[in-house]
Amino acid sequence: MNQSYGRLVSRAAIAATAMASALLLIKIFAWWYTGSVSILAALVDSLVDIAASLTNLLVVRYSLQPADEEHTFGHGKAESLAALAQSMFISGSALFLFLTGIQHLVRPEPLQAAGVGVVVTLIALFSTLALVTFQRWVVRKTQSQAVRADMLHYQSDVMMNGAILVALGLSWYGWHRADALFALGIGIYILYSALRMGYEAVQSLLDRALPDEERQDIITIVTAWPGIRGAHDLRTRQSGPTRFIQIHLEMEDNLPLVQAHVIADQVEQAILRRFPGSDVIIHQDPSSVVPAAQQGFFER
């Protein structure tokens, strides 16, 4: 799983870096030629895109390193750190947009050769749409937090490019403050995306439990197994591509140890079939030693 995961996530990061680099060169020319503050906003965002995607590429490769003596649970949390770093980069670019937009709102300037800006923005819009489509497919296959953060960033780019087209069109017809107003609006949206991304990264670093539907799937698997009277203390978290699942199973007091082990092993394999690559720890408890207040999800 890790090989397939690493290959897909690396390809997504390489594709994002290559596209952002190409668009950066085009946007530098377009900004120099038109003087559009919205295109300048997109140019700055492309710089952030390159830095973020390169960070993703390096971090993903590091996160896939096997566990060692100092990192016995692996290096998957590096992905969450990358997402947190991205949120900081993006927040910085949003603040830059605010300052630039306010400056041009106070002192509006007519655009030069707005048609060039429209062509460049259309190229950026369709290129970014293609990248986001590919990233969404990678996220669906891998659930990578780093790629999901990158995808959210590029989704904001799609919104940005659409807003730039409208701003350029309005400025073309004499509404020169529209360029600055849209830059401010874009900055607000980017800042919102950055805060949401940072929140998700922090939750992962704090070992937030798996989603409710995944925990319910685990409970469903356990409840379907004969020989298990109950279950409690389900604890879950995720680090990179790896889910960590711990659960206590309640069994008959007089069940032979070997048979209890076989049942627990079968349950573990069933969980792994549902969540491949997970780290599963199962503890077996005689049902009589479990206090009533701790008895868990069901009782047969």
Swiss-Prot record:
<comment type="subunit">
    <text>Homodimer.</text>
</comment>
<keyword id="KW-0997">Cell inner membrane</keyword>
<comment type="similarity">
    <text>Belongs to the cation diffusion facilitator (CDF) transporter (TC 2.A.4) family. FieF subfamily.</text>
</comment>
<feature type="binding site">
    <location>
        <position position="153"/>
    </location>
    <ligand>
        <name>Zn(2+)</name>
    </ligand>
</feature>
<feature type="binding site">
    <location>
        <position position="157"/>
    </location>
    <ligand>
        <name>Zn(2+)</name>
    </ligand>
</feature>
<keyword id="KW-0472">Membrane</keyword>
<dbReference type="GO" id="GO:0005886">
    <property type="term" value="C:plasma membrane"/>
</dbReference>
<dbReference type="InterPro" id="IPR002524">
    <property type="entry name" value="Cation_efflux"/>
</dbReference>
<dbReference type="GO" id="GO:0015341">
    <property type="term" value="F:zinc efflux antiporter activity"/>
</dbReference>
<feature type="transmembrane region" description="Helical">
    <location>
        <begin position="156"/>
        <end position="176"/>
    </location>
</feature>
<comment type="function">
    <text>Divalent metal cation transporter which exports Zn(2+), Cd(2+) and possibly Fe(2+). May be involved in zinc and iron detoxification by efflux.</text>
</comment>
<keyword id="KW-0479">Metal-binding</keyword>
<feature type="transmembrane region" description="Helical">
    <location>
        <begin position="24"/>
        <end position="44"/>
    </location>
</feature>
<keyword id="KW-0410">Iron transport</keyword>
<keyword id="KW-0406">Ion transport</keyword>
<keyword id="KW-0864">Zinc transport</keyword>
<dbReference type="GO" id="GO:0006882">
    <property type="term" value="P:intracellular zinc ion homeostasis"/>
</dbReference>
<dbReference type="GO" id="GO:0015086">
    <property type="term" value="F:cadmium ion transmembrane transporter activity"/>
</dbReference>
<feature type="transmembrane region" description="Helical">
    <location>
        <begin position="114"/>
        <end position="134"/>
    </location>
</feature>
<feature type="binding site">
    <location>
        <position position="45"/>
    </location>
    <ligand>
        <name>Zn(2+)</name>
    </ligand>
</feature>
<keyword id="KW-0862">Zinc</keyword>
<keyword id="KW-0813">Transport</keyword>
<dbReference type="Pfam" id="PF16916">
    <property type="entry name" value="ZT_dimer"/>
</dbReference>
<feature type="transmembrane region" description="Helical">
    <location>
        <begin position="82"/>
        <end position="102"/>
    </location>
</feature>
<dbReference type="InterPro" id="IPR036837">
    <property type="entry name" value="Cation_efflux_CTD_sf"/>
</dbReference>
<protein>
    <recommendedName>
        <fullName>Cation-efflux pump FieF</fullName>
    </recommendedName>
</protein>
<dbReference type="InterPro" id="IPR023783">
    <property type="entry name" value="Cation_efflux_FieF"/>
</dbReference>
<keyword id="KW-0812">Transmembrane</keyword>
<keyword id="KW-1133">Transmembrane helix</keyword>
<dbReference type="InterPro" id="IPR027469">
    <property type="entry name" value="Cation_efflux_TMD_sf"/>
</dbReference>
<feature type="transmembrane region" description="Helical">
    <location>
        <begin position="178"/>
        <end position="198"/>
    </location>
</feature>
<keyword id="KW-1003">Cell membrane</keyword>
<dbReference type="InterPro" id="IPR027470">
    <property type="entry name" value="Cation_efflux_CTD"/>
</dbReference>
<dbReference type="GO" id="GO:0015093">
    <property type="term" value="F:ferrous iron transmembrane transporter activity"/>
</dbReference>
<dbReference type="GO" id="GO:0046872">
    <property type="term" value="F:metal ion binding"/>
</dbReference>
<feature type="binding site">
    <location>
        <position position="49"/>
    </location>
    <ligand>
        <name>Zn(2+)</name>
    </ligand>
</feature>
<dbReference type="InterPro" id="IPR050291">
    <property type="entry name" value="CDF_Transporter"/>
</dbReference>
<keyword id="KW-0408">Iron</keyword>
<dbReference type="Pfam" id="PF01545">
    <property type="entry name" value="Cation_efflux"/>
</dbReference>
